Amino acid sequence: MTGLLEREALLGLLAEARREGGRLVFVGGEAGVGKTSLVREFCGRADARILAGACENLATPSALGPFTDIADRAGGPLAELLAAGADARAVARALLSEVDDATIVVIEDVHWADEASLDVLRVLGRRVDGVAGLVVATYRDDEAQGDHPLRTVLGELATSPGVERLTVPRLSLEAVRQLAAPHRADGDAVHRLTHGNAFFVTEILAAEADSLPETVRDAVLARVASLEPGARRLLDVIALVPVRAELWLLEAVAGDVLAHLDECIGRGILRTDGDGVAFRHELARLACESAVPAARRRLLHAAILAALESPPVGGPDVSRLAHHAEEAGDSGAVLEHAPAAARRASAAGAHREAARQYRRALRHGDGLPASGRAGLLDGYGLEAQLTGQASEAADAWEEAAALYRESGDGVSEGRALGWLARACIPAGRNAEAEAASRGAIDVLESLEPSPELGRAYATQAYMRMLNRDNDEGVAWAERAVEVAERFGDLETLSYGLNTLGTSHLVAGEVDTGIALLLRSFDVARENGLWLWIGPALSMLGSGLGEMYELERSEQYLREHIAFTEEHDLWPQYSRAWLALVYVYRGRWEAGAELAHAVLAQAQDSISRITALVAIGRVRARRGDPGAFAVLDEALELATPGGHLQRLGHIHAARAEAAWLAGDAERTISEAEAAYPLSLEKRHLWFAGELAYWRAQAGRADAWPEWVAKPYRLELEGSPRRAAEAWSARGCPYEAARALSASNDAADVLGALEELQRLGAGPAAAAVRQRLRALGVAAPRGPRPATRANVGGLTIREVEVLRRVAEGRRNADIAAELVVSRRTVDHHVSSILRKLGVGSRGEAARAAAALGLLDDPRHEDADGPHVPSASPRSGERAERPRPS
């Protein structure tokens, strides 16, 4: 029995990937389906050096664990870097230097990978096409579902040229019959029981029982029961050590039964693994682990813990110590090792693992003094916030603040309250954020001045800036800067300057804001404060975008995205803003593409809101369906916060969508939903656009003369000057919209030409209606069915979608379009994502709804009717006077 029936095609694909070189191949499949056996068979056939490592099934995995295994085999710079505590990027670079055409790197079970190891995989995926070798990573696809961290990594690397994915299928009925025949077993019954899972099949057949066990656990334990008692006791120990048990560890814990090791290996239960042994299948280990009585399990974990505390070479692995300490019920050891493991994981960039270790310590920390437990909560709160667990972080800092108050530590209480405020904002707990921020200031102002007071001022400034209370934001930020400079607190100085600059910038004081933000950037860069370099660039990009300084906005957004990619930070908010900038600059296809990519990856509300607004604007302006669907989602996300910087964008986009759909009443209601707030905050651009849509829909009351110049000129009835102002800011759609209000037919024809170039169907239809009313022949527009970019799709994606709707297979589509099957696979995945559907059938229905399957000869080129945005010839529109 080879155990590798029906695997030759997969082995061939792996061999092809090795021949091509520069590949990271993810091999997925359910637990026990045969991923590891496939990779071992491939490696056994290859004439290559094999560097293998595995992720551990610990409650909290060791940071960079699989790469430590690889370093033990490779030695050299990689081992030196890991011993020195290098970060994920450095580890990835060192590993890539080992990957040549004579080397295969294998990383097993990456669904258990710690965060730092996932970061290494990200870098490998982006850069592996620059080397000659092959990296293979196995994972359980049935465990990496939903919001699993590995799923995010796979999504991010989906378009990387050097990354491929293979799926190991279950064995067919015929294959199971072939495997069962030598054992005289009922192959049909085995297949019914196992559904073709290779491990289940192998274990059941290996049991060689007269009747089939009811479960795989029974099969595994039946095999174990036939071993000598000493061998069973040895398996009890090995089953409690995830991944691999070193021989020295077994000598220390189970030396009296170590002689039975060969028996366990010979019976196919264990396999050798370097200087240790491991179960041949993880499911077998789990089955054996579950059979160890609870009292014996605790005693064995305690013995393993004692041995691991004094390894024969090097220092102890605190992650493993924390795991076995908890399993042994040794709270003292947990409190010693779990915080140390958390700090080590955090330093390696594995913040999720750090948070888990702090949670582990907190589970055992009820008996600690108030200050001791508060310190653990501090650590957990920070790691939770860094990993997007805002509510958990807020709860931790709330408890920490109470404990510091109980212990009389006012400075620490104030610091915790400040962090609590920051955590409550993304958690949507705005009232708590306000109370915590004010509480931090009250506590710290009652004490001697301290750096923590400056941080509290900076947090209050940040909150005021977010709500566009710009004068208050400036005042609080100036106080933060003054305290930071007094104490030489460079981090708070950069933080305060960041908020100070942003407050000036979004108040319309653009040059002042830029200068302050660049100073914040310089302070961070010159002092190695990497945490604050990114925010300076991000605020420059998004703030300038909000002020329609689009060229400079794009420059800083690109710089921030490049910075995040270089340092493996989170780029999605800047990518969402860049998508919106593309839309305003008339690059609708690029904007929609990028916004959809953001939605595929981002979970934070602010990134999603911005991307949804970009998509909603494009859909409304093109006349595509679904504009309000995405804008409804954006509004739902933004409403709890109540911040103008979100609501202003959303209601302006919704007012425009309503106007282009011919609904004047809804245009007014959407505009007025945020107009009073925009006036209260004196926001030049939100107030200007909302006033414009109110006026277009007939609400002709006073508007403030301080609104942004392009909108002021439109409201005053100066279409040419308004168009020039929009053109100067790089906004072709807005310029054409403004020019269409001219009484000069040549101007209106020019506006129509630009709107048609952009694919702005509804606005172009309104302009053609007006031209007819003026007695001017309106040129026929492009046919909707031939217009590219419907629903945010590229021209090629539209071609593929039409063929999908016809029921064509990907291979047939590839042959017809003369592209690779893989290219068509990528197109289909992109189409499903952009259309928000989950199947080819749903995509076909969406294609019909978008008009992609209609005969273009029967379509009305004028598109839907919308109210005219311009006065009739010889008339001057009634314009409200400035207040």
Regions picked out by a protein language model, each given a short descriptive name:
Residues G32, Y139, A287, H323, ...:
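Tandem amphipathic alpha-helical repeat scaffolds
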Residues V33, S37-T103, W112, A132, ...:
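Conserved phosphate-binding/catalytic loops and adjacent sensor/switch elements of nucleotide-binding enzymes
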Residues Q769-R772, R780-H858, P871-S883:
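Helix-turn-helix DNA-binding segment
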Residues G22-L24, L38-F42, T68-D69, A102, ...:
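Extended alpha-helical scaffolding segments used for macromolecular assembly and cargo binding
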Residues G266, A342-R343, L362-R363, A401-G408, ...:
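Amphipathic alpha-helical segments of tetratricopeptide repeats
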Residues V120-L166:
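Sensor-1/coupling segment of RecA-like P-loop NTPase cores
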Residues A31-V33, L171-L368, G379, L677-K681, ...:
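Short secondary-structure boundary elements
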